[in-house]
């Protein structure tokens, strides 16, 4: 099992334009290549490629030009400059004899309705994270786990070591999230469960090993929306074979339709009785085949479904 993450997905594609967030944050191995005709490396790759189709990787911002409402005022000029230089869907239209399968990741910005008027006929599918507007050949895909943010970041290795570790759950619910990343969604959640004997609430930062260990010691985990619609926590929860508890959302109901998830209208509805009555979701999580969350199998299936 090799978990899904944005960098690994980028590496699997025939050509990657890199991502803006990695370059902005100067993370290890970052790069960003322009999605326009001045990118002669890409043009040459197209001309030398003998396959009927190519797989491409890019971040959501540079996939297509539009007005992004969620951009903070101080970031707008930077975001606009990215879209001014790069527009992958427009670039694909310049090569009508080649077909493209596009993947995105490493991005919090959502895919919106404007995309549907931008897709050229030779793009077979767009497989994007945070694709809250989806349908036809636009498919939402998992955010997966966090990439390595510095040379000492060993979280992927820790997660791999924990996937098959058998830890018997001692409690029902685990709560661990930073409120400041989305106060509107997350404020007040911790307080709902602080005095509950059947829940463990982390009120301070713990290391990644302890986080995953505590997650495995519970059957369910609260998974609220964070910086983006999707969150690495959702997928860490599934890799640990624990049940995400999420507010009802048509995006997640579609994206996670193959996995046991407890959807609620409000986190205040989460009670001990509710979790006990949904024990079957935990049992299902122990039996479910997670092959679809292996990066190679995930990638191959999308390509095969697209061609």
At which residue positions do the language-model features occur?
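Nucleotide-sugar donor-binding catalytic core of glycosyltransferases
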Residues: 1-235, 239, 243-259, 274, ...
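Conserved acidic donor-binding segment of nucleotide-sugar-dependent glycosyltransferases
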Residues: 261-267
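A cross-kingdom feature marking charged/low-complexity
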Residues: 268-277
